[in-house]
Amino acid sequence: MQKGKGAYDTGSYPNYLAEAGLHDEQVSRRIQEVFETIFFDPEQGFYHDVDEDSGCMEDTGNHDARTEGMSYGMMMCVQMDRQDLFDKLWCFSKRYMLLHEGRNAGYFAWSVQLDGKHNAEGPAPDGEEYFAMALFMADHRWGSRGRFDYLADGREILRHCIHQPELTGGGTMWNPENKLIKFVPDMEISDPSYHLPHFYELFAEEADEADRPFWREAAQASRAYIAQSAHPVTGLSPEYAAYDATPVLLFGKPWPWYSDAYRVMMNIALDTLWFGPRPEHETLAVNIQRYLATQLPEENYRACMLDGTRTEEPAMHPTAITATCAASVIAGRSEHAGMWLRRFAELPLRTGPRRYYDNCLYFFCLLMLGGQYRIW
């Protein structure tokens, strides 16, 4: 990668895992193996065919299908050039999750049962943003003249995200003043792990023309928010936070650094890979690599306060922590960077009922560290 530039400018996607002894052919083989496990392994996979023309990703810990997982699956498929599976996931999402009435029309129910019956009638914005990005990439990779008009579908999602009040009377997914993504449309708080400035840079090229300046501003606002919400010493980010980046505790959890928050490490890595290094991302990455190096091995990980104070609560997704911390090496290198890359290179997929979230993040980190998470 050229100094100061990312893959958007250079077209270069380095294999960071070569440093851990995995060369391009080995990485490609590992990526294919993990993809096959997620989608086709009868014991360890979590993709299911539902109808002849649709399928879903199961959250194996909660036995439901979530917009998070459905959109993750679509991103996996567009990266792996599997239009057949992509279309099955998008068909399920439109058929069973898309909301047609009321304030949330145009959004997607964040949780449904595996047969499509709704568990919720509200959305979670991390699903919508991944849906839109996967659809735009599908348009670029395969075109929009087949079963679905990917470009039109992606634009419609983003139109609802920022124009919902005039379309349905509902809440926006981004605050129109500060350009920060919300945790849910009707709560004026955020989730640092929802902030994907690298997606918003591309939304600014693909969304409705009139909305493109909004997305450019959102990218800059999110980069600032990610830095602001991270602890200045440990690099830990809260799961939920106010617009001033102070932690918000929800769902009876007294600790702020927990499952959602691990994605921040992965997100700054991909922003760096695509759009180049940033001092604030480097600082966060270096700090969190140093902190987490003191918490190993994986079975020792705990839910934490942002200053690093441990609680007695075990981390629910330890594989995801190691995977995303390794990915953060793309954004910044501490003295532990090589150790984290080697640890990830030797890390197996998670098994058991909580494998869905860990292995989704594992796959994305494998793609980006292996130089194969591309801008299509």
Give the ranges of each region predicted by the language model:
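Extended ligand-binding clefts on enzyme/binding-domain cores
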Residues: Q2-V34, F40, H63-T67, G102-G106, ...
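Internal amphipathic alpha-helical repeat/solenoid segments
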Residues: R30-Y72, C77-A120
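Aromatic-rich carbohydrate-recognition surfaces in CAZymes
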Residues: H63-M70, G116-W142
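Solenoid-repeat scaffolds in large eukaryotic assemblies
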Residues: G73, L85-F86, R147, G154, ...
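Short glycine/serine- and small hydrophobic-enriched flexible loop segments
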Residues: M74-D81, Y130-R141, H198-E205, M266-L273, ...
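Alpha-helix boundary/capping segments in eukaryotic regulatory proteins
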Residues: D81-K88, E121-G127, R141-F148
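Alpha-helical repeat scaffolds
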Residues: R212-Q220, M339-A345, W376
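Solenoid-like repeat scaffolds
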Residues: R343-P353
